[in-house]
C-alpha cells in the first residue's frame, strides 16, 4: 500500500503586478523573502515523526488571479497543508490571497519604508475577515532597510509558532482515532464524540470492540519473532517493585510470566491496529496488516477487560514512550480508559513538540499547610504555594521520569530523534514495574512506577466538551517539583504507591483560576490531564484558534498569545474575543 505523504508548507510570494518597471524591480526581493522563509522553516522544524519539513514555493510571484490559481494547482498536487504569503510591497489584496477555507494561513508583510508591505498586509487581512477566512498577521516590530534579507526575531517567532500549529492541523486531518472499547467507568471523555473529531479535527473515529484485541492475541495475529524479542528486552530491562497484594492474590512465577507476555502482546497488537504491520500480511493476515490509519488511540480496559485479563498499563506506558524493544522510536498516542478528550490533548502536545506525553489523573491538591501537618515539611521554592499530585496507573510515558538531558545537562523530555539509547536505558532504569492491585485489576497486570525529576518546565492541558458550546481547551504552565524522599514517601503511600508520580506546581498569576494552586485544581474540567514538556501554552493557544476551540483557562503571558487577526474584531478583551470568534466561524471542518 502506498505510504501517505506528510503535509508540506506552501510559500506564496505576492507582488505588485504592474509591469514596465514596478514588478520587475520587486521580483528578486519578493522571491528571496519566500526562499528565506522556507530556509528558516526547514532548518528549525521537523514533523512529529522526525522527518524533515518540506516547503513548496510558488513557481512565480503572484500578482493576480491567474498566478494565484497556478500556485493553488501546484500546492494541491503536493499535499500543502498550510500556507504563508510573503511580500515586501503593495499587491492586490483579495486577488492574491489563499482562499482555501480549511488550510491554516498567515501573511508576512515586510516592515519597510520603500514599499508598503504593511499596507498590503492590512488590505489582505481585511479581505480575509470580510470573506470569513481567518488568517494570521506577521509584521515586524522594527523598520528594516529594503536590502535587509534577515528575518527579525519577532517575525521568526511568529513564523515558527504558526508553522508548528499549522503542521499539527494538517497532520491530524484525514487520520483516525482508534476507540478500542467503549465507555470506561462512566468517564465522559470515553463517550467518544464522532462529530467533535470530524468537525473540529478533520478526523474519523474507528470504533473497535475489545474482543478484536482478544482475537488477535488468541489467534496469533502478530509477529511471533517480535514477541520473543520483546520478552527478552523486558527480561533485561524491567525492574519489579514489591507486590502489595494480599497473599491469596499474589501470582506465582509462571502466572506472572503469562501476565507479562500478554501485556507485551497487547502493546504489539494495539500498535498494529493503529498503523498496520506488513509482517501480518506475510502470515496471511492481509486485512489486519493494514491497520486503521490511527494517529491516536484509546483503550477502555476498565472494567470489562481488566476484570478478566491483564490491564493496559504496561502496553499503554510502552506505546506512549519513545522507545521499546526495537530501540528509540516515535512515541504513539494512547489514552488510558479510552479518554478520547485527553487523547486529543496528548495528540496536540505530541504534534507541537514531537515528544512523548504524560497522561495523569489530576489527583490531589496538597496545600502547604496540609503537607506540613502530615509530614512536618515546609514547602519552599517552586512548591511554596502548594502542589498538585499527578498520578495514574496507565499511560504515562516512561520519558516522564525526565532522565533525558538537554544541552545544559538539565532533566527534560526530548523528541525521539534527539534521544540516545543511554537516555532510554536511564528512563527504564528509573522505572519499577509493580503488580497491579487485585481489588482494582482482577486480571492482573503491571503498573509503571517512576518519580519525575523536579524543576522541569511543563504545560498541563485538557480538552473538555461543553453542551451548547462545544470543545474548550485548558492550559496550565508550571514546573515539576522534587520533594525530600521521606516527604514523597509519606504522601505517595496515602494513595496508590505503585503508580508513576509527578508533583506539579502551576505558575500563578493572582487572578481567576490562577489565583492560587487550589483554584487551578478547582477549575480543572475533568479528572485527567496531560503534561507536555516545556512552557508551550502559546503554541496550544495558536493551534486551538486554528481549530476554533476556545481556551477557557490559561496562564500564558498576553504578549505571547497569537491568534488570527480577525479575532481583534470580536471585542476588546482577548479571551472574550476567542469565544466570540470561535462561535462566529464555527468548527474548522463544518459539518
UniProtKB/Swiss-Prot annotation:
Alphabetized UniProt keyword annotations: Carbohydrate metabolism, Cytoplasm, Fucose metabolism, Isomerase, Manganese, Metal-binding
Keyword Hydrolase: no
SUPFAM superfamilies recorded: FucI/AraA C-terminal domain-like, FucI/AraA N-terminal and middle domains
Keyword Transmembrane helix: no
Subcellular location: Cytoplasm
A GO MF term: arabinose isomerase activity
Role according to the record: Converts the aldose L-fucose into the corresponding ketose L-fuculose.
Family matches, as HAMAP family: Fucose_iso
Name the UniProt record assigns to this protein: L-fucose isomerase
Gene: fucI
Amino acid at each position: 500500500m502506498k505510504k501517505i505523504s506528510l503535509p508540506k508548507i506552501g510559500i506564496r510570494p505576492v507582488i505588485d503586478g504592474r509591469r514596465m518597471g514596478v514588478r520587475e524591480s520587486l521580483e528578486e526581493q519578493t522571491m528571496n523573502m519566500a526562499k528565506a522563509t522556507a530556509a528558516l522553516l526547514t532548518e528549525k522544524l521537523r514533523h512529529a515523526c522526525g522527518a524533515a519539513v518540506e516547503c513548496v514555493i510558488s513557481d512565480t510571484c503572484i500578482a493576480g488571479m491567474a498566478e494565484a490559481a497556478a500556485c493553488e494547482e501546484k500546492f494541491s498536487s503536493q499535499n500543502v497543508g498550510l500556507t504563508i504569503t510573503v511580500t515586501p510591497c503593495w499587491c492586490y489584496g483579495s486577488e492574491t490571497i489563499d482562499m482555501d477555507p480549511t488550510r491554516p494561513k498567515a501573511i508576512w508583510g515586510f516592515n519597510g519604508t520603500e514599499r508598503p508591505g504593511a499596507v498590503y498586509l492590512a488590505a489582505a487581512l481585511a479581505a480575509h475577515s470580510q470573506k470569513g477566512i481567518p488568517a494570521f498577521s506577521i509584521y515586524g516590530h522594527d523598520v528594516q532597510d529594503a536590502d535587509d534579507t534577515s528575518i527579525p526575531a519577532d517575525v521568526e517567532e511568529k513564523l515558527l509558532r504558526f508553522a508548528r500549529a499549522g503542521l499539527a492541523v494538517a497532520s491530524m486531518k484525514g487520520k483516525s482515532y482508534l476507540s478500542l472499547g467503549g465507555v470506561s467507568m462512566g468517564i465522559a471523555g470515553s463517550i467518544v464524540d464522532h462529530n467533535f473529531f470530524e468537525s473540529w479535527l478533520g478526523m474519523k473515529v474507528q470504533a473497535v470492540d475489545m474482543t478484536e484485541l482478544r482475537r488477535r492475541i488468541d489467534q496469533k495475529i502478530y509477529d511471533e519473532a517480535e514477541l520473543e524479542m520483546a520478552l527478552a528486552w523486558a527480561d533485561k530491562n524491567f525492574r519489579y517493585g514489591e507486590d502489595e497484594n494480599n497473599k491469596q492474590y499474589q501470582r506465582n512465577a509462571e502466572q506472572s510470566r503469562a501476565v507479562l507476555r500478554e501485556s507485551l502482546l497487547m502493546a504489539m497488537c494495539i500498535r498494529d491496529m493503529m498503523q498496520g504491520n506488513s509482517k501480518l500480511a506475510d502470515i496471511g493476515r492481509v486485512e489486519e496488516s493494514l491497520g486503521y490509519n490511527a494517529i491516536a488511540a484509546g483503550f477502555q480496559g476498565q472494567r470489562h477487560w481488566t476484570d478478566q485479563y491483564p490491564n493496559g498499563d504496561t502496553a499503554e506506558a510502552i506505546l506512549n514512550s519513545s522507545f521499546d524493544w526495537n530501540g528509540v522510536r516515535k512515541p504513539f498516542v494512547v489514552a488510558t480508559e479510552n479518554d478520547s478528550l485527553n487523547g486529543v490533548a496528548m495528540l496536540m502536545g505530541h504534534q507541537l513538540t514531537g515528544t512523548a506525553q504524560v497522561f495523569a489523573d489530576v489527583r490531589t491538591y496538597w496545600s502547604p499547610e496540609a503537607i506540613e501537618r502530615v509530614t512536618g515539611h515546609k514547602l519552599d521554592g517552586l512548591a511554596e504555594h502548594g502542589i498538585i499530585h499527578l498520578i495514574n496507573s496507565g499511560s504515562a510515558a516512561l520519558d516522564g521520569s525526565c532522565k533525558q538531558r538537554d544541552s545544559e545537562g538539565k532533566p527534560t523530555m526530548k523528541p525521539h530523534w534527539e534521544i540516545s539509547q543511554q537516555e532510554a536505558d536511564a528512563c527504564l532504569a528509573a522505572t519499577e514495574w509493580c503488580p497491579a492491585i487485585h481489588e482494582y485489576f482482577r486480571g492482573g497486570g503491571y503498573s509503571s512506577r517512576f518519580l519525575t525529576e523536579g524543576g522541569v518546565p511543563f504545560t498541563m492541558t485538557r480538552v473538555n466538551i461543553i453542551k451548547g458550546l462545544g470543545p474548550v481547551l485548558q492550559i496550565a504552565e508550571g514546573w515539576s517539583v522534587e520533594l525530600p524522599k521521606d516527604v514523597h514517601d509519606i504522601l505517595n503511600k496515602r494513595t496508590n504507591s505503585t503508580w508513576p508520580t509527578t508533583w506539579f506546581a502551576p505558575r500563578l498569576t493572582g487572578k481567576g483560576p490562577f489565583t492560587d494552586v487550589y483554584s487551578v485544581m478547582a477549575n480543572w474540567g475533568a479528572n485527567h490531564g496531560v503534561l507536555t514538556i516545556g512552557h508551550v501554552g502559546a503554541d496550544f493557544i495558536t493551534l486551538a484558534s486554528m481549530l476554533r476551540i476556545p481556551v477557557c483557562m490559561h496562564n500564558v503571558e498576553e504578549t505571547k498569545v497569537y491568534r488570527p487577526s480577525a479575532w481583534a474584531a470580536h471585542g476588546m478583551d482577548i479571551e472574550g474575543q476567542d469565544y466570540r470568534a470561535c462561535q462566529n466561524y464555527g468548527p474548522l471542518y463544518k459539518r
